[in-house]
Amino acid sequence: MAHIEKQAGELQEKLIAVNRVSKTVKGGRIFSFTALTVVGDGNGRVGFGYGKAREVPAAIQKAMEKARRNMINVALNHGTLQHPVKGVHTGSRVFMQPASEGTGIIAGGAMRAVLEVAGVHNVLAKAYGSTNPINVVRATIDGLENMNSPEMVAAKRGKSVEEILG
């Protein structure tokens, strides 16, 4: 698994995986490459992209462009999550829970890259089921998308934040 990290303006870019794939035709095989990348501002914005091309650099470039276009906002709580969350995509299930200051990112592979660029500094996370990087990234982003801040919950219920936090 290749890891490249670049700063593009204020965005952090991480390459999670590059894979050679082939298409079989009458004359033999046609090889191409796929790249999976994540992009984030380190402050709650994160996106992922999947690109495919005949050459590795072109696949990475396509993936980075898609990642920049598909960014979501995540409401973080002082560098950690608001509450424990689960994310699911096909056969991958992820569980993430907030951790105290100084814990660091305790997560594996593709999940770690997503959490780093999103700006999460303290989290405990575990991937269950399929560890296919694409599915793990999608499940992680699904979990982060489904996380609600106390302000969001209070607005939905028509109550004050103090009532929600009890």
UniProtKB/Swiss-Prot annotation:
Superkingdom of this protein's organism: Bacteria
A Pfam family reported for this protein in Swiss-Prot or TrEMBL: Ribosomal_S5_C
Gene3D superfamilies: 3.30.160.20, 3.30.230.10
GO MF annotations in UniProt: rRNA binding; structural constituent of ribosome
InterPro entries assigned to the protein according to its UniProt record, in alphabetical order: Ribosomal_Su5_D2-typ_SF, Ribosomal_uS5, Ribosomal_uS5_bac-type, Ribosomal_uS5_C, Ribosomal_uS5_N, Ribosomal_uS5_N_CS, Ribsml_uS5_D2-typ_fold_subgr
One GO cellular component, as annotated: small ribosomal subunit
Comment, domains: The N-terminal domain interacts with the head of the 30S subunit; the C-terminal domain interacts with the body and contacts protein S4. The interaction surface between S4 and S5 is involved in control of translational fidelity.
Subunit description: Part of the 30S ribosomal subunit. Contacts proteins S4 and S8.
Full protein name: Small ribosomal subunit protein uS5
